[in-house]
Amino acid sequence: MGRKKIQITRIQDERNRQVTFTKRKFGLMKKAYELSVLCDCEIALIVFNSTNKLFQYASTDMDKVLLKYTEYNEPHESRTNNDIMEALNRKEGNQGGGNSDDESPGPSTSPVIQITMPAVVNGHSSNNSVASAASASAAAVAAAAAAVAAVEGTSSGAAAAAAALQASNAQRHHNLNLYQNLIFNPNYTRHLNQRNDPLSSTSVAPSSSSSKHLDFPPSTSFAYDTSRLHPIAAADADCDLVPSSRAAADQNIWSSALQQRPVSQPAPSISNSSTNGISNGTSSLLSPNVSSLNGHSVLDLGGPNLPYKLDPNTYVKMEPHSPPEKRPRITTEWRPQQLT
């Protein structure tokens, strides 16, 4: 059943005519605004009612738009009521009474391609669902390209486009499986390294040249044996690691070390310096006790009893793996300087 055709004639009632004018005028300005925004154009709308009242609308500025109007002598398009009536009648006859505002058919719409996303389980998508989604998207894109090319009349181009899309999607599918195996399958990297052994063997050569420049290894990279150190260095190295039960063993080490050393000269006697302005307490500190251990002179500096004794005539260098005879000892006798 066709739609009833509406006759556009003058409204006889004055009140109804004013109401219709107000509504249609606002609708006309609204359409002009939409046209100016959507199509980026300038519009000047001038309306006089039945009592010669002026109503105007301009998208930017009326004077600027009218100035552009006066600059053009020949308008690109000019229509009157008769032209519009003919267009409306022709449109209603073709479309069966349609009331669409646009005369153009609008942009052509291509078939909608719907791609199903893979289901996510516990924050991770399964390999089968991702692979099926990739293959489905590849087939859909290839079909769409073939359909568009067929519409344009290029069958050979459609086949070439479909083949290219299938090749690219196959490579993408291969890369997708590789990434998923690297992320979700820890054992995959081991097999991947076994397959890429020729590549790894070729990369060994440049790394061997750079191995010549080695930094000092950390202390945790090798076992630190203090048995070959000098006794004092060994005691310093083991001070935080050796329990109190090894105090006797340390003293035995010192005894054996002192027995292996040659007999040194006795320490020079230090005269009493109290006559030089030094108190007796200070002179007692400057005149240490000299005792003997296994036939060797040993200097006793006082204070708490240490697990070992110091030999005053022996030069000991506090460095690991460094012999005591690295630098010569000053053998000349020294005397404390007098205070003036």
UniProtKB/Swiss-Prot annotation:
<keyword id="KW-0238">DNA-binding</keyword>
<comment type="similarity">
    <text>Belongs to the MEF2 family.</text>
</comment>
<dbReference type="InterPro" id="IPR036879">
    <property type="entry name" value="TF_MADSbox_sf"/>
</dbReference>
<protein>
    <recommendedName>
        <fullName>MEF2 transcription factor homolog</fullName>
    </recommendedName>
</protein>
<feature type="compositionally biased region" description="Low complexity">
    <location>
        <begin position="269"/>
        <end position="283"/>
    </location>
</feature>
<dbReference type="GO" id="GO:0043565">
    <property type="term" value="F:sequence-specific DNA binding"/>
</dbReference>
<dbReference type="GO" id="GO:0045944">
    <property type="term" value="P:positive regulation of transcription by RNA polymerase II"/>
</dbReference>
<dbReference type="GO" id="GO:0000978">
    <property type="term" value="F:RNA polymerase II cis-regulatory region sequence-specific DNA binding"/>
</dbReference>
<dbReference type="GO" id="GO:0005634">
    <property type="term" value="C:nucleus"/>
</dbReference>
<dbReference type="GO" id="GO:0007168">
    <property type="term" value="P:receptor guanylyl cyclase signaling pathway"/>
</dbReference>
<dbReference type="Pfam" id="PF00319">
    <property type="entry name" value="SRF-TF"/>
</dbReference>
<feature type="region of interest" description="Disordered">
    <location>
        <begin position="193"/>
        <end position="217"/>
    </location>
</feature>
<dbReference type="GO" id="GO:0007165">
    <property type="term" value="P:signal transduction"/>
</dbReference>
<feature type="compositionally biased region" description="Low complexity">
    <location>
        <begin position="200"/>
        <end position="211"/>
    </location>
</feature>
<comment type="subunit">
    <text>Interacts with histone deacetylase hda-4 isoform b.</text>
</comment>
<keyword id="KW-0539">Nucleus</keyword>
<feature type="compositionally biased region" description="Basic and acidic residues">
    <location>
        <begin position="318"/>
        <end position="332"/>
    </location>
</feature>
<keyword id="KW-0805">Transcription regulation</keyword>
<keyword id="KW-0804">Transcription</keyword>
<dbReference type="InterPro" id="IPR002100">
    <property type="entry name" value="TF_MADSbox"/>
</dbReference>
<dbReference type="GO" id="GO:0046983">
    <property type="term" value="F:protein dimerization activity"/>
</dbReference>
<dbReference type="InterPro" id="IPR033896">
    <property type="entry name" value="MEF2-like_N"/>
</dbReference>
<comment type="function">
    <text>Transcription regulator. Binds specifically to the MEF2 element, 5'-[TC]TA[AT][AT][AT][AT]TA[AG]-3' in the regulatory elements of target genes, such as chemoreceptors str-1 and srh-234. Involved in transduction of sensory signals, together with egl-4, kin-29 and hda-4; binding to histone deacetylase hda-4 enables negative modulation of chemoreceptor gene expression in chemosensory neurons. In response to starvation, negatively modulates expression of chemoreceptor srh-234 in ADL sensory neurons, acting in concert with basic helix-loop-helix (bHLH) transcription factors.</text>
</comment>
<dbReference type="GO" id="GO:0042826">
    <property type="term" value="F:histone deacetylase binding"/>
</dbReference>
<feature type="compositionally biased region" description="Polar residues">
    <location>
        <begin position="258"/>
        <end position="268"/>
    </location>
</feature>
<dbReference type="GO" id="GO:0042594">
    <property type="term" value="P:response to starvation"/>
</dbReference>
<dbReference type="GO" id="GO:0030154">
    <property type="term" value="P:cell differentiation"/>
</dbReference>
<feature type="domain" description="MADS-box">
    <location>
        <begin position="1"/>
        <end position="61"/>
    </location>
</feature>
<feature type="region of interest" description="Disordered">
    <location>
        <begin position="258"/>
        <end position="283"/>
    </location>
</feature>
<feature type="region of interest" description="Disordered">
    <location>
        <begin position="312"/>
        <end position="340"/>
    </location>
</feature>
<dbReference type="GO" id="GO:0014056">
    <property type="term" value="P:regulation of acetylcholine secretion, neurotransmission"/>
</dbReference>
<dbReference type="GO" id="GO:0000981">
    <property type="term" value="F:DNA-binding transcription factor activity, RNA polymerase II-specific"/>
</dbReference>
<feature type="region of interest" description="Disordered">
    <location>
        <begin position="90"/>
        <end position="112"/>
    </location>
</feature>
<dbReference type="GO" id="GO:0000122">
    <property type="term" value="P:negative regulation of transcription by RNA polymerase II"/>
</dbReference>
